[in-house]
Amino acid sequence: QTRQWQQWFELAAESRDPLARLGWFERIIADANLLFDEAFWQAHAGHGWQVPEARPLIAARAGRADCLLRLGQLGQARDEYLALLALCRADEPACRHPLSTLYAWQGEWDALQQLLVRFDEASCWLLYNKALMSFVCEGEAAARPHLAAAIGVNPHVPATLLGQRRLPKQEPRRWQGGSRDEAALYALQSREAWLTHNALIWLRKSAGKQAS
């Protein structure tokens, strides 16, 4: 069974289309859900990732949420991310990153601020989305230091968001902090948020000043 799930994970990773990826994750979820009842989840609430046999199901649910986000099904994606954050309080699947983008896209600034307080970290997603929030809510001057901090963590994001660097046809399977692959994944998930709030002109101007 685990071998079959691994094959489905591989097929999901190879799929360029988020709808096709979603189908593979749904297969894993439907298969794995049969192994765990409500009592199991209640017994491990907040620490689900600590149970190794539950990790494939949790990872598949996180993958499903990412696909829903890419497909614009934001309500369903939000519900799944929040359920996973309740199940894994330490957020081992890193749902906080795409969830921060979802909140920014929707303009749910209070929710984003609460997420930033809960996870006080210098990660690409949280810093760039914090800069976007500051730009929208407080203006260019207030957002400038937040953007500088984000660029310090990953300098490749502005060029990727602005289309100066071509995006890959499918999401990177692996990435390291500060890498071009991380920037590509952030841009694939988050560009709509920046477009929605008309922030790309400011980003182009501000990133240019940072580079000069």
Say what each PLM segment does:
Residues 1-2, 27-54, 85-87:
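Flexible helix-coil transition and linker loops at the boundaries of alpha-helical arrays
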Residues 3, 20, 49-56, 73-76, ...:
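Structural signature of alpha-solenoid helical repeat junctions
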Residues 5-8, 61, 96, 127, ...:
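TPR repeat positional signature
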Residues 15-18, 71, 106, 137-138:
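Structural motif corresponding to the intra-repeat A-B loop/turn of tetratricopeptide repeats
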Residues 22-36, 78, 82-91, 104, ...:
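TPR/TPR-like (Sel1-like) alpha-helical repeat modules
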Residues 52, 87, 118, 179-180, ...:
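Structural signature of alpha-solenoid helical repeat scaffolds
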Residues 132-212:
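Long, ordered, amphipathic alpha-helical scaffolds
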